[in-house]
A protein has these predicted regions:
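Asp-based phosphoryl-transfer active-site loop
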Residues: 2-17
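Active-site metal-binding loops of divalent metal-dependent hydrolases
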Residues: 9, 67, 211-213
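Conserved acidic, metal-coordinating active-site core of Asp-based
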Residues: 93, 98-214, 218-222
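Short, structured coil segments at secondary-structure junctions
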Residues: 55-58, 66, 165-168, 222-223, ...
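Mg2+-dependent phosphoryl-transfer enzymes with acidic/Ser/Thr/Gly-rich catalytic loops
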Residues: 1-4, 21, 181-264
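Short active-site oxyanion
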Residues: 35-39, 58-60, 145, 205-206, ...
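Active-site phosphate-binding/coordination module
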Residues: 19-119
């Protein structure tokens, strides 16, 4: 029996328009009534995820910023921040590649270290209040997420090069078709879900997770039942326990219904 279910957002739980299908909220509440916790596991920050789940935000859990922010029932149970040294080295490396552009995030703000118009347009779709800067934030600013926008779509090649250059400080994972997440070593969606599992006293075999991209790799490998979307990257589907349908067909919601039916 599953006691904790985690789902990625873009390309997984969200539909093709980047929206939460309305039935999702009822499913989350129904799962909770049966003793099953639901967690959104995403590269997005906690504050952004709360906007997606406003009707049920206090009745669910969050593994946000790729595991750097972990919340259970609205209470923080884990947080990880980047060292200023690591961020400085990342900024220096990214600056050498004309196709790469760095975005940094603290708990509520987004910082764009670039003035390239294409980059700004892309980021503004999701972060309308982002602040454009030309120097790194002060070391007193707690950075919880770092992402790199790849303006030519060469995310796999770029992630490989960055990993070779900065593997001591980061783990790089493609996220979608244009982004690369720069994660702290040992911090991932898997480490975040592990904190939730410890908080609730839940075993790995009692956890199910859904994902579609390479920043879902660790969590899909960690949980007892890892499910890759039909639209997932081939490497993720290869290591998943199951492959389910597409996000545009609300496949995650269908799987949640099946879990509920098994509990009836």
């Amino acid at each position: 029996m599953f006691k904790l279910i985690a789902s990625d957002m873009d390309g997984t739980l969200l539909n093709e328009n980047g929206q939460v299908p309305p039935e999702t909220y009822e499913l989350i509440l129904a799962l909770r009534e049966h003793g099953v916790h639901f967690a959104a596991s995403s590269g997005r920050r906690y504050d952004r995820l709360c906007e997606f789940f406003a009707p049920v935000r206090d009745k669910m859990d969050f593994v946000a910023a790729n595991g750097a922010q972990v919340y259970a029932d609205g209470k923080m149970v884990g947080r990880e921040v980047y060292s200023h040294l690591a961020i400085r080295k990342l900024a220096q490396a990214v600056a050498t590649f004309p196709n790469l552009h760095l975005a940094l995030f603290d708990r509520t703000k987004s910082f764009l270290l670039d003035d390239e118009s294409k980059f700004v347009r892309e980021v503004d779709k999701d972060l309308p209040n982002a602040e454009r800067i030309w120097e790194l934030p002060d070391p007193s600013v707690n950075i919880i997420k770092a992402s790199i926008f790849c303006d030519d779509g060469a995310v796999m090649d770029s992630a490989y090069v960055l990993q070779r250059e900065l593997g001591q400080f980061f783990t790089f994972a493609p996220s979608g078709n244009a982004w690369i997440d720069a994660m702290q070593p040992g911090v991932s969606k898997a480490s975040g879900i592990a904190q939730l599992a410890e908080h609730y006293g839940i075993g790995r075999d009692e956890i199910m997770a859904f994902g579609d991209s390479m920043n879902d790799y660790e969590i899909i490998r960690f949980v007892g039942t890892g499910c890759a979307m039909e639209n997932a990257r081939p490497a993720l589907k290869a290591v998943a326990d199951r492959v389910v349908g597409c996000n545009r067909d609300h496949a995650v919601q269908q799987e949640l219904r099946r879990v509920l039916e098994s509990l009836a």
